């Protein structure tokens, strides 16, 4: 099954009135998203060997919250939604959607917000980005979207991605339409922007027990059934790993068919789990999975592969 977004004027009357039994798509809920992430990162930093980096990531997440409200986006996506629906493509496809100057405006605002909090190498990195030309910034953005991580240093990538993510999340939040689950391919990618997940979460509340993958760019979540590989959709050779016990709130789901893994966070075990923060704070589990010979099928927005990785 894949997910397609249907324009408002193409919805049937029943689709306008009622929601699907299982919502295939959860658009980003931007209110307090970044503050909640920052708080969770700071909480997880306590007694964590990666504490300093988690606090660094929390500073970026908090800056995203500030910039989100200081620089709102106004955009009519109606035409774009119709075109993408007709083509069966993600409406905010990172590989084809033209970027306007708004994302670079967001980057400069993030840098201004972060400067007083940064020192040493981190300050030098954002000052370097501040001096970069418009074209240089566009080239780095294009390289990240093409997974050409050797062209963007791993210390610059989180700042570039933070601005791009804000921009794409703002656009996703403006999408007029409704998602419909249909037969198709490439369920492992975000149906809104085509980017990769950061992790998956088994939720509580109105979506109790359902698993949703969380986009590492536009913050959208999309439904993928449990006990099925999110990367290749096979189900015969899955294994579940944790550092604690069977009741752990964070597990890695590995697949011997494709050789990859993705983390699953369980809200019923820990209601405060957050897709980005808890993934970043559990890198010890990633190290274990690498030792077992599995490759990660996701990317955390605060941790990009360096050259040669």
Swiss-Prot record:
Belongs to the FdhE family. The keyword Cytoplasm applies. HAMAP family: FdeH. Gene3D superfamilies: FdhE-like domain. This is Protein FdhE. Keywords: Cytoplasm. One of its GO terms (cellular component) is cytosol. It is found in: Cytoplasm. It comes from the Bacteria. GO terms for biological process: protein maturation. The keyword Cytoplasm applies. Coiled coil: none annotated. Pfam families: FdhE_C (PF24860), FdhE_central (PF24859), FdhE_N (PF04216). SUPFAM superfamilies: FdhE-like (SSF144020). Necessary for formate dehydrogenase activity.
């Amino acid at each position: 099954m894949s997910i397609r977004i249907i324009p408002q004027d193409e919805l049937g009357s029943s689709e306008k009135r009622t929601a699907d039994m299982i919502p295939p798509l959860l658009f980003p809920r931007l209110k307090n998203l970044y503050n909640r992430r920052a708080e969770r990162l700071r909480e997880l930093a306590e007694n964590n060997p990666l504490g300093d980096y988690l606090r660094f990531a929390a500073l970026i997440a908090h800056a995203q919250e500030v910039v989100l409200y200081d620089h709102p986006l106004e955009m009519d996506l109606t035409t774009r939604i119709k075109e993408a629906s007709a083509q069966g493509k993600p409406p905010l496809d990172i590989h084809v959607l033209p970027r306007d100057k708004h994302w670079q405006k967001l980057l400069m605002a993030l840098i201004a917000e972060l400067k007083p909090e940064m020192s040493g190498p981190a300050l030098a990195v954002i000052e370097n980005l501040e001096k970069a030309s418009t074209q240089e910034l566009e080239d780095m953005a294009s390289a990240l979207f093409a997974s050409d991580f050797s062209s963007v240093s791993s210390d610059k990538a989180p700042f570039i991605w933070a601005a791009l993510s804000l921009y794409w999340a703002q656009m996703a939040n403006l999408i007029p339409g409704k998602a419909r689950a249909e037969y198709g391919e490439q369920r492992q990618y975000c149906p809104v922007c085509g980017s990769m997940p950061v992790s998956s979460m088994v939720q509580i509340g109105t979506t109790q027990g359902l698993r949703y993958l969380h986009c590492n760019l536009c913050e959208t979540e999309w439904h993928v059934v449990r006990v099925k590989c999110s990367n290749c959709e096979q189900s015969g050779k899955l294994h579940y790993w944790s550092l604690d016990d069977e009741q752990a709130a964070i597990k890695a789901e590995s697949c011997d068919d494709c050789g990859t893994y993705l983390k699953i966070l369980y809200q019923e075990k820990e209601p405060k789990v957050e897709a980005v923060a808890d993934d970043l704070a559990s890198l010890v589990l990633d190290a274990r999975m690498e030792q077992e010979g599995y490759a990660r099928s996701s990317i955390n927005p605060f941790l990009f592969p360096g050259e040669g990785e």
